[in-house]
């Protein structure tokens, strides 16, 4: 499964002819309003609220629901999607690929493994 987090990342991956099975966007780029990436093949649209700097229970539940929905799935976040990379790495099946943008750096690609899940869980534990 390929999962993108972020409007620019999603837009760039789609422009390469790759359709992420799950796309998480918020209509923002570097905290500025932008048009959402175009994708006329979306089968399922889910929404959630997630304020900047937080990971809400609603977003976690929406991410979990996405993995049992018909792909391609787009999650539209009211707020900010940046930190949702973390619960995505926990919920994604092993061998999934999670892509997100690191501002002013480039694209980050995470191959989900048990080791990645353990590292992410430690980060989430510290955040709680």
Task: Describe the role of every protein-language-model region.
Residues 1-73, 77-117:
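Conserved mixed alpha/beta catalytic, RNA-binding, or beta-rich assembly cores of soluble enzyme
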Residues 112-128:
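Charged phosphate-binding loop/patch that engages nucleotide di/tri-phosphates or the phosphate backbone
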């Amino acid at each position: 499964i390929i999962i993108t987090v972020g409007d620019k990342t999603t837009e760039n991956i789609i422009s390469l002819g790759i359709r992420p099975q799950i796309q998480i966007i918020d209509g923002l780029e570097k905290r500025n309003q932008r048009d959402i990436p175009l994708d006329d093949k979306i089968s399922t649209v889910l929404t959630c609220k997630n304020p900047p700097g937080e990971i809400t229970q609603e977003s976690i539940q929406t991410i979990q629901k996405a993995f049992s929905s018909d792909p391609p799935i787009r999650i539209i976040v009211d707020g900010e999607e940046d930190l949702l990379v973390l619960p995505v790495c926990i919920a994604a099946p092993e061998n999934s690929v999670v892509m997100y943008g690191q501002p002013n750096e480039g694209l980050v690609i995470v191959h989900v493994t048990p080791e990645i899940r353990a590292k992410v869980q430690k980060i989430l534990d510290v955040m709680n």
